[in-house]
Amino acid sequence: MEAITTNGITLRRTVAAAQGDDALRAMGERITGALGPAVTDWSIAHGELTLIVQGSDIVYALTYLRDDPNCAFRCFIDICGVDYPQRARRFDVVYHLLSLRHNMRVRVKVQTDAATPVPSAIPVFPAANWFERETYDLYGILFSGHPDLRRLLTDYGFEGHPLRKDFPLTGFVEVRYDQDEARVVYEPVKLTQEFRNFDFLSPWEGTDYVLPGDEKKSS
């Protein structure tokens, strides 16, 4: 009975997942049909719908997703960035929305580069304000129409954008408190390392070398 019950639960979960994918597929077709060329591609993965939207149409797309009763994605979750240095438009701006009415999530992506701003989503979702500031701070992605596009997490005068793939792991400057000057000071990062003489003939490496003093008398 337990095995049958377990198989029954697994079967029901499989059917539910298939029904969920069918609902997401219907939602994707509905959205792409309504938005037309504003949506360049869409896909379903891990139970979530992903839309690729033209940057210039992001406000239009977000407004439709929020206001259309067949979508009702009114819960704004967050905005984040992703860096793909090998691409000409290296950045993805990713918007995550939730529809409580339809129990669905949608991921909206916009591709851009460091010089091309993305229209701000604040007119549609005011909560996007600080998320756009965070994305600008960490990736250097610009948002046109933002009322106060300043850094949010890094320090004043911070150089670079720390979540870019080409940003050095050590950063450019070291921030520390100088007790002699009684203030915070900024200094170039110095990774000095004193000379170390490695013993490459160590027996722990499993080599066949014989170190001085380890010779055995021949029998």
UniProtKB/Swiss-Prot annotation:
EC number annotated for this UniProt entry: 7.1.1.-
PROSITE patterns: COMPLEX1_30K
GO molecular function (one): NADH:ubiquinone reductase (non-electrogenic) activity
SUPFAM superfamilies given in the database record: Nqo5-like
Record Pfam families: Complex1_30kDa
Top-rank EC class of the record's enzyme: translocase
Catalytic reaction(s) noted: a quinone + NADH + 5 H(+)(in) = a quinol + NAD(+) + 4 H(+)(out)
Bilayer topology: Peripheral membrane protein
UniProt record similarity statement: Belongs to the complex I 30 kDa subunit family.
Function statement: NDH-1 shuttles electrons from NADH, via FMN and iron-sulfur (Fe-S) centers, to quinones in the respiratory chain. The immediate electron acceptor for the enzyme in this species is believed to be ubiquinone. Couples the redox reaction to proton translocation (for every two electrons transferred, four hydrogen ions are translocated across the cytoplasmic membrane), and thus conserves the redox energy in a proton gradient.
Name of this chain's protein: NADH-quinone oxidoreductase subunit C
Organism the protein comes from: Methylorubrum populi (strain ATCC BAA-705 / NCIMB 13946 / BJ001)
Taxonomic path: Bacteria, Pseudomonadati, Pseudomonadota, Alphaproteobacteria, Hyphomicrobiales
Gene: nuoC
